Amino acid sequence: MVETLRNPDGSWSFSYDVFDKYVEFMAENGIDRNIECFTMVPWEMKFRYFDKASGEYRFLEAPSYSSEYRELWTATLKSLKRHLQEKGWFDKSIIFMDERGLDQMLDAVSVLQEATPDFKMGLAGEYHRELVDMLYNYTLGNRCFFTAAELERRRQKGLVTLMSVSYTHLR
C-alpha cells in the first residue's frame, strides 16, 4: 500500500496515498485501534519499487542481513515514522511480521532499533526466547508457550501477548 520509489540519484522516496485511504476507510468503519504494517521480511525477500530513472517497476532482492536491505528499510522506517506522526497515527502503529525465523527477526529488529527505536514491532509466529522482551506484540501459535516468568514480565512492561489458535491439525 506504500509505493516505494527509487529516485535517479539512488535515494528512496515513498507515496502514502493508497495507505492513507485504506487507514481512513478502516477507521470510518470502526477498525482503528492499531495500524499493523506488514512486512519487513516478505516470503521471498523481494521488494517492489518504481524506478524513476527507467520509468519501470523493478524488484530489489535483498536478504535481511544485506546492506541493501538495511539501506532500504532505514529509509522506509524513517519516512513512515514521519508520515505517521504527521497524521497522528504513530502511537498506534506496529511494524509486524508473520511466521518468520529468528535470524530474520533479529535482522529486522536491529534495523528498526537503529533507524526508529521508538517504533513498536510485533510477530505472529513461533516462540523465540531471544525475542520475548524485544517485541511490543507477540502472538504465539497454538503449540508454543511463554514461561510464567516471561508472561509476567511482558505484562508488567505493558506488552501485548496473544495466542493464535488453529484447529487444522484436528482434521
Language-model regions: role of each:
Residues 1-119, 124-135:
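Aromatic-lined carbohydrate-binding surfaces of glycoside hydrolases
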Residues 116, 134-138, 156-161:
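Glycine-enriched alpha-helix->loop->beta-strand junction motifs that scaffold or abut catalytic
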Residues 131-146:
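Short, well-ordered secondary-structure micro-motifs within conserved domains or adaptor modules
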Residues 146-150, 157:
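Long amphipathic alpha-helical scaffold regions
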Residues 168-169:
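Conserved small/polar residues in nucleotide/adenosyl-binding loops
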